[in-house]
């Protein structure tokens, strides 16, 4: 039976469809004859306890020069019988949080929201990994520049990054004796006012930062290793990393088995976990990517697997 699939995303005008996971989800929903509705960015509202949005009928095509057609926008109540894909990219700022609160009200009115709005509020993608310390490298999250500096000195090499970044932005590699360490810490913590994360530098990054996708807590059998290029230490695709599919190894599956049940319990139906070597570094719940690359390299239809789960009610 056709469903109404409502997508909350960044402007569709600016996406790169060859790599855009949200676009792959829309293609699959349309292939299944579901009705697509595009939410005008920033248009969620609350009126007398009901969530509304400006939405337009959407058609998509796998054509890099002409990939969508929008109908006329109109005010639509969000609720009963709808599938709402919350696919806005970080940062998870106040406006993002407010949108999830409005989506929680739509969920209470009968919508199925993916991922669960409460989980999106609760699970910062850097901090969430620390729910599973047995899987993680040595990590410190702090505003205290002195403590962060001592951590780098103890580990000898460390990665330093903000808690709200994505795509490799504002990530630093530093080491004991680095003359730039103080200014890096001043920048990341805004002079001690903002939390930042420090993790032991993992040499295995040269083999790739593995993105493992979970659907209802169960891993896809292949991951995408994002391999840094040249003298770059970041594997992120947005930072120029090269993506190479690989079958999951035993340690990957063990980490997924630690993380998956808790993600499912929290309603995080589509999740990306990042693994470097033997260690979990992040849990991506807002808008996990790498689906299109894995589909292309492995002959998969990951969006189809997700919609199979959605259509059964989960």
Swiss-Prot record:
Which residue numbers delimit the ATP-grasp domain?
A: 125-311
The protein's matches in HAMAP family, at most eight in alphabetical order, are given as: GSH_S (MF_00162)
Q: Which reaction does it catalyse?
A: gamma-L-glutamyl-L-cysteine + glycine + ATP = glutathione + ADP + phosphate + H(+)
Give me the Gene Ontology terms describing cellular component. cytoplasm
Which named protein is this? Answer: Glutathione synthetase
Cofactor(s) needed, names only, are: Mg(2+); Mn(2+)
| Positions bound to Mg(2+) | 282, 284
Residues binding ATP: 151-208
Pathway entry: Sulfur metabolism; glutathione biosynthesis; glutathione from L-cysteine and L-glutamate: step 2/2
Q: What is stated as this protein's family in its record? A: Belongs to the prokaryotic GSH synthase family.
Q: Per UniProt, which keywords does this protein have?
A: ATP-binding, Glutathione biosynthesis, Ligase, Magnesium, Manganese, Metal-binding, Nucleotide-binding
Which domain of life does the UniProt lineage start with? Bacteria
Fetch the PANTHER family from UniProt.
GLUTATHIONE SYNTHETASE (PTHR21621:SF4), RIBOSOMAL PROTEIN S6 MODIFICATION PROTEIN (PTHR21621)
What EC number(s) does its UniProt record assign? 6.3.2.3
Entry-linked Gene3D superfamilies = 3.40.50.20, ATP-grasp fold, A domain, ATP-grasp fold, B domain
Cofactor mode of binding and number, as noted:
Binds 1 Mg(2+) or Mn(2+) ion per subunit.
In alphabetical order, the GO MF annotations are: ATP binding; glutathione synthase activity; metal ion binding
């Amino acid at each position: 039976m056709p469903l109404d699939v409502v997508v909350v995303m960044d402007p569709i005008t600016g996406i790169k469809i060859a790599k855009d996971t949200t676009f792959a989800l829309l293609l699959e929903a349309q292939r299944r004859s579901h009705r697509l509705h595009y939410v005008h960015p920033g248009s969620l509202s609350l009126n007398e306890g009901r969530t509304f949005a400006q939405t337009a009928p959407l058609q998509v095509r796998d054509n890099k020069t002409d990939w969508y057609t929008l109908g006329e926008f109109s005010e639509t109540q969000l609720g009963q019988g709808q599938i709402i894909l919350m696919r806005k990219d970080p940062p998870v700022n106040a406006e993002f949080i407010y949108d999830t609160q409005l989506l929680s009200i739509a969920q209470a009115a009968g919508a199925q929201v993916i991922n669960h709005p409460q989980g999106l509020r609760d699970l910062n993608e850097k901090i969430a990994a620390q729910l599973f310390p047995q899987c993680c490298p040595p990590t410190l999250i702090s505003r205290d520049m002195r403590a962060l500096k001592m951590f780098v000195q103890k580990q000898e090499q460390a990665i330093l990054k903000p808690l709200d970044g994505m795509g490799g932005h504002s990530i630093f590699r530093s080491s004991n004796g680095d003359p730039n360490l103080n200014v890096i810490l001043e920048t990341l913590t805004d002079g001690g006012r903002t939390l930042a994360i420090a993790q032991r530098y993992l040499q295995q990054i040269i083999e790739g930062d593995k993105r493992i996708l979970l659907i209802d807590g169960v891993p896809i059998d292949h991951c995408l290793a994002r391999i840094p290029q040249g003298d770059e230490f970041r594997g992120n695709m947005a930072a120029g990393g090269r993506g190479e599919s690989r079958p999951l190894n035993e340690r990957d599956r063990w980490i997924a088995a630690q993380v998956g049940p808790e993600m499912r319990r929290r309603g995080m139906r589509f999740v990306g976990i990042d693994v470097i070597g033997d260690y979990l570094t992040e849990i991506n719940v807002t808008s996990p990517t790498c689906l299109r690359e894995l589909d292309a390299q492995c002959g998969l239809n990951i969006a189809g697997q997700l919609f199979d789960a959605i259509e059964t009610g989960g």
